């Protein structure tokens, strides 16, 4: 783009398009079903679509199983517009059930939270049947039967599509740990073979009228930044995400492998970008759902995938488990990067150095997306160096810009504001119209924009820099944007700090304000006293942490840095201190 013709509004200028080849710039999203889309991109029915613990599954099997399961779902009473609660990990049957739900006009409902939250989701769905793994406990089954309309539960053995003996011992151990003392049983339970048999017998019409815009996939946000909400996607919106990435496809000469490990399909990014995208782009999909996150290094070395879905927790384990030899060759890894949460400059430097030390020349990148946007919103295609929140440029059909928080007023380049996106992957909405209206807003340009709640800015080349989640003002002035604060410390290269991150908690003495706490992971032989002066010297006054706390390692919960848990600990300790202080004051008064 000619810089002289720029308006100063990213949504109009779209400067990022210069990084895409001319042939891709008019990319159109197909208006078709997921099944039609996968068949359109299928390299051949005899080609292996998925590998699952020693079992190679051909595309022909995917199509055949989908047909049988669609009829089985109809036999159980599911039909057009119904919600099918599914509590499966990323096993082959998850793919079949998703495609079968589409065929009968229903939608999958996935949730991976507490039992109470899962039961609540099922109750709201009105479903009388749920699908789960056979490690469902009897007390869990009874909870579904008593607190929702569920009458039947279809149970699947995780090894139905593989031989258990083909799993490494540590995978078997992880799988075994999921089984309770008393498994679900009784008249309400239907085994997988019994379920399939019902499909074989069903002789009615299974296929609903095609509607690519009806709900197909429902999942819940993680709740890491607020109350968990149900996000609803259609075949059209999911294809809207996948189609913007699948031009990185396999060829007749080289077919890359892609591993998805540990992560549950109840995370929209896992189902859309982690499973559907590789299937639609001629990659060999390696399903590895029962790998413990602490064993991700072993599975990486066993499968040697060309790429796999990484999150910061996995990278930490790979670097620090101590099982990867100094001379181990990781050159098979052709792409490497993380999503899921912000990644500061110190983390980025550590990861890039680790790759380089192990003969991997891939540039370690950070991505950006959300459940509401269908997962990936950006790609790391610009030559700009990674770091400082750089998450790349908008994907081909997405328009991303920055707006004054709480408004629809678009800001110009390098101005901090709320990140908003408009594109074909946006959710249909939440399960409540009020929340949907707040998140999806039609602007004066006639486009529907998702207001993400994230803060950041865009430069003149269209590179997006994500800085923090929401505003966190400190009493007396200054906004506690966590990533820039962490990067300030990372760039200072303070001797003794291996990793560091901030947790921002409510200031109970000043309503609407917040206080920062700094957590550090130190090198051997160092203490907080050794680094505190340098830490405070490089931070502005409003950034000064209330306390610097040493941890042995970065804590994770539900695949993200456990800021929620640490916040609860801080608030609990603060309340205990105040309670003790009041007790002392009363004693002194007496």
PLM features: what roles do these ranges have?
Residues 1-76, 80, 160-161, 166-184, ...:
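N-lobe entry segment of adenylate-forming
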Residues 52-56, 69-114, 258-264:
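Conserved AMP-binding/adenylate-forming
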Residues 58-60, 207, 216-243:
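Conserved AMP-binding A3 loop
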Residues 105, 239-258, 266-309, 320-323:
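Conserved AMP-binding/adenylation subdomain of ANL enzymes
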Residues 122, 130-135, 423, 428, ...:
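AMP-binding/adenylate-forming catalytic core of the ANL superfamily
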Residues 184-190, 194, 306-309, 322-387, ...:
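Gly/Ser/Thr-rich phosphate-binding loop
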Residues 393-397, 409-441, 478-480, 526:
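Conserved ATP/PPi-binding loop(s) of AMP-dependent carboxylate-activating enzymes
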Residues 501-506, 517-521, 531-590:
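Conserved C-terminal "lid"/linker of ANL adenylate-forming enzymes
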């Amino acid at each position: 783009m000619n810089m002289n013709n720029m308006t100063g509004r990213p949504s109009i200028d779209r400067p990022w398009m210069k990084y895409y080849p001319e042939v891709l710039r008019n990319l159109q999203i197909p208006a078709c079903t997921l099944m039609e889309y996968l068949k359109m991109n299928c390299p051949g029915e005899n080609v292996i679509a998925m590998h699952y613990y020693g079992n190679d599954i051909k595309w022909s099997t995917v199509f055949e199983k989908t047909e049988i399961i669609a009829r089985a779902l109809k036999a159980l009473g599911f039909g057009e517009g119904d919600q099918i609660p599914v509590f499966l990990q990323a096993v082959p049957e998850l793919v079949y059930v998703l495609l079968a739900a589409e065929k009968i006009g229903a939608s999958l409902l996935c949730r991976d939270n507490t039992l109470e939250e899962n039961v609540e989701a099922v109750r709201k769905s009105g479903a009388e049947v749920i699908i789960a793994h056979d490690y469902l406990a009897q007390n869990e089954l009874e909870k579904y039967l008593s607190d929702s309309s569920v009458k039947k539960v279809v149970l699947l053995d995780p090894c139905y599509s593989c031989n258990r003996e083909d799993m490494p011992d540590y995978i078997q151990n992880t799988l075994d740990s999921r089984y309770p003392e008393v498994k679900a049983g009784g008249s309400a339970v239907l085994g997988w073979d019994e379920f399939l048999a019902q499909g074989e017998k069903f002789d009615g019409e299974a296929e609903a009228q095609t509607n690519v815009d009806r709900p197909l996939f429902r999942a819940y946000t993680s709740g890491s930044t607020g109350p968990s909400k149900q996000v609803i996607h259609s075949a059209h919106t999911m294809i809207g995400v996948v189609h913007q990435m699948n031009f990185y496809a396999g060829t007749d000469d080289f077919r890359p492998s892609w591993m998805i490990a540990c992560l549950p399909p109840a995370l929209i990014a896992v189902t859309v970008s982690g499973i559907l995208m590789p299937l639609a782009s001629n990659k060999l999909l390696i399903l590895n759902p029962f790998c413990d996150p602490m064993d991700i290094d072993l599975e990486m070395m066993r499968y040697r995938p060309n790429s796999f879905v990484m999150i910061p927790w996995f990278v930490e384990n790979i670097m620090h488990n101590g099982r990867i030899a100094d001379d181990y060759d990781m050159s098979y890894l052709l792409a490497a990067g993380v999503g899921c949460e912000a990644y500061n400059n110190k983390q980025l430097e550590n990861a890039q150095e680790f790759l380089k030390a192990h003969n991997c020349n891939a540039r370690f990148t950070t991505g950006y997306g959300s459940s509401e946007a269908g997962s990936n919103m950006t790609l790391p295609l610009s030559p700009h160096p990674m770091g400082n929140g750089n998450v790349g440029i908008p994907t081909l059909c997405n328009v991303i810009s920055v707006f004054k928080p709480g408004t629809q007023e678009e800001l110009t380049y390098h101005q901090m504001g709320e990140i908003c996106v408009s594109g074909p992957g946006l959710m249909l909405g939440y399960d409540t119209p009020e929340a949907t209206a707040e998140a999806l807003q039609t602007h004066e340009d006639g486009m529907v924009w998702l207001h993400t709640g994230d803060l950041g800015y865009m430069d003149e080349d269209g590179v997006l820099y994500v800085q923090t989640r929401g505003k966190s003002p400190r009493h007396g002035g200054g906004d506690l944007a966590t990533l820039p604060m962490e990067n300030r410390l990372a760039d200072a290269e303070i001797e003794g700090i291996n990793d560091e991150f901030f947790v921002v908690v409510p200031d109970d003495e000043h309503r609407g304000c917040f206080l920062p706490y700094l957590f550090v992971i130190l090198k051997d032989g160092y203490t907080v006293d050794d680094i505190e002066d340098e830490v405070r010297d490089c931070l502005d006054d409003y950034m000064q942490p209330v306390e610097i706390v040493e941890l042995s390692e970065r804590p994770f919960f539900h695949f993200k840095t456990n800021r929620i848990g640490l916040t609860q600990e801080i608030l609990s300790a603060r309340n205990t201190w105040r309670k003790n202080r009041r007790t002392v004051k009363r004693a002194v008064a007496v």
